[in-house]
Amino acid sequence: MTARSEHHPADSAAAPALRVSGLRKSYGEVLAVNGVSFEVASGEILGLLGPNGAGKTTIINTVLAVLTPDSGSIRIGDLDVSRQRSLALARTNFAAVYASLPGNLTVVQNLSFFGLIYRVRFLRRRIEELLGQFQLEALRDTKCGVLSSGELTRVALAKALLNRPRLLLLDEPTASLDPAAARDTRSTIRALVRDTHCGVLWTSHNMYEVEEVCDRVLFLSHGQVLLAGDPRSLPREHGARNLEELFIQLAREPLAHPAERLA
């Protein structure tokens, strides 16, 4: 197993990459997120876990200001998303399997297009850096519509890093990849966190992946945080053999595991 990112939140007094406080969001009479609070420190990979419908996507969409919360606050660094939306989102980026890239554009055209949207300074230089970092030089003039899933994931991650985000949101980033490509992607992201000290909020249903890559995890159910802690020690603390068994227990009997206050 490869080493995780080194995370020492106590070493710095800087604001966390992300701070969510008392977040609530409902759709009509359905309460999707109910008073959720957590932080992602700079240089930390935090896993956001839970069954379908637990509230993960709603949380991500409120952080990205796609949705407006009913109450609560979201801060990216020292910026309040509700008051300083553009500045806060300029420090943020996002990658997911379902966030497809324009297939009629080449790799370089896609990166150029999004780089202009993000107002990236010295864009050509930045694109060349990312092409090298993600081993995309040979594909630079290939249209994204003919790339493999692994190649598309590398382009999507390069796109997400164009603006050197302080906060990176990754929703199932390896879901469409074969094991070798998924392993390489995890290694790349860990190296990026180590080198750039950005914070990462990572969702996944792959518990092996979560144990390998995440510094901490939050378990969600019915829009609430049930458990939070180190993915390697949580199973033992709650009588499960591994993280997958704990996930299944929480998904089936969430009320048996009261929420714990985050440190």
Which residues fall in each region the model found?
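Conserved ABC ATPase signature
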Residues: 143-147
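Conserved ABC ATPase "signature" region
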Residues: 112, 116-139
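Conserved catalytic motifs of ABC-family nucleotide-binding domains
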Residues: 164
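Helical segment within the ABC ATPase nucleotide-binding domain
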Residues: 183-196
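Catalytic Walker B motif of ABC-type/P-loop ATPase nucleotide-binding domains
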Residues: 168-172
